[in-house]
Amino acid sequence: MKLTSHEEYGLRCLIRVAQQGPGGKLTIPEISSAEGISDAYAGKLMRMLRLSGFVVATRGTGGYALARPANEIVLSEVMALLGGRLFEGDFCATHPGQLKACVRLPDCSARVLWRAVQAAVDDVLKRTTLQDLLFDEQQMMVHLKHLRESAAPARWQ
């Protein structure tokens, strides 16, 4: 499993805008230069983020700003826009190989594992905001430790 470039760069662009603080703006060239991507790709990602209500654009040389405070932007919403889930519940039924149905469909330990992994990822993303991603690495580790310690075991099943 790995993140797509849309997920990685889209999130990085959104973090970059959030780093400007309330009301702060960045233009496409500023975003693309800071993130090492083309203007066209930054523009495509920012358009997606704008159409989904994460950022607002000011025409001309105004640039992009957050549409709402960073502490109100939940990562599960952002990641759903940029790429979706790592493991979809119907994966086994839709990927049987050359057979009509996966031979392990009735009893599959791997499916249980992937569902638990997805539940853990979902839990972290639902309880993490864009504001949390403005932490430095050490602060983020503390945040994640807190999430892990406060997670109910049933959440990850």
Predicted feature locations:
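A short alpha-helical element within helix-turn-helix/winged-helix DNA-binding domains
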Residues: 26-36
